[in-house]
Amino acid sequence: GGGGFAWWAFPPGVSRSYEADEWLGAGAALDAAAEAGRGCEFCLGFSQGAMLLAVLLARGRLPDCRVAVLAGAGWPRPFAEDLRSYRDRGGRPVGGSLVQPAVLHVTSEQDRINPREQALEVHRCLGGDVLEHAAGHALPPDGDPAAAALARWAALRLAA
């Protein structure tokens, strides 16, 4: 408990999202995030938010999203089949999506919350680019070259 925001709860005995076979309240979280992302061309998710964003992209529930940044994602185990299905379709849009978004996966070898390998597994399913930084389970801080790289990456894709 760092007192942060949680999109869902865990079943008894589970302490990390990637360990859970079920996310309690995930349906409401997916609906709320899809509604909040309506009309957005740029979406950024961090930690649980990145996992949620990965599921929404795989399901085609953010039809206006052209650019997505997933930072500190873990493997969304209860929704693994959604991501694998997206990969197996060649990343083709589903649902309401007509756009295949550019995706940046922001990872850190020093992430002690969601192991880097899990973010890379999400990357293998959704495709896109990977940005590494040394700040752990966080977005790269201002002044870090990785923060500037993230901003440049997003600006170039939004300008396209």
Residues of each region from the PLM?
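Serine-hydrolase catalytic machinery in alpha/beta-hydrolase-like enzymes
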Residues: 1-42
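Gly/Ala-rich beta-loop-alpha elbow adjacent to hydrolase catalytic centers
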Residues: 41-53
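Short glycine-enriched nucleophile-adjacent loop
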Residues: 50-62, 68
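Short alpha-helix in the alpha/beta-hydrolase fold that links the catalytic acid
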Residues: 82-83, 114-124
